[in-house]
Amino acid sequence: LSTDAPPAPAVPNTFEPPTAFAYPPLAWNAARFRFEVRQAPGEGGTKALCKTIENKLFQRGQIFIGRPGSKNYTLEMDVLTEGNKRKMSEIGLINQRYLVVLKGNSQQLEVSSNQERFRESVPFAWVPNQWYRLKARVDVAADGSGSVKAKAWKKGEEEPAVWTIEVAHKHAHTEGAPGLFSFTPQEQRAWIDNISVVPNNTATR
């Protein structure tokens, strides 16, 4: 391919100095250019998945890491948002088509599906630059009704015995790929680490 037109000028990344990174697994749908594997903050040199902020077109990142027919599993992971008390990002997971999100600026833990049609939240106080553990599962009854359960707690502390939020759904989703989510509208990086997907019958609590 050749052209007489001059090449487009390179656009520098003005958000950060040159940073070493690796791409996420290729099989993770739509992960590249939205997420990168980088050295994690405060993790002693370990690597974590970073939601990038230099491209404003990709402020919202939603990726799937498993098969669409997956069901009856518990998904959990470590999460962190950079920022301050007035500027935080959103980080969450997708379990069986339900989006479970820690919302920074509104200080909530939210469960939603199809956004406006199904959405419930509870207050949850959390701070930037601190790792938390986020966990969720979906239980579906024989009559098709279901319950979405999620909890979050500060990493390093004991897991709470009760769920932070539990939402009933009359017609529950019976399957759906596990996934990851982040929204960075105020250019604060979000981080995800130590992802675990296990069958519900082997998950603790």
Model-derived features with residue positions:
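Flexible glycan-contacting loops in extracellular carbohydrate-active proteins
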Residues: E159-W191
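Short tryptophan-centered beta-strand motifs in secreted/extracellular beta-sheet-rich domains
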Residues: L75-M77, N129-A142, G146-A152
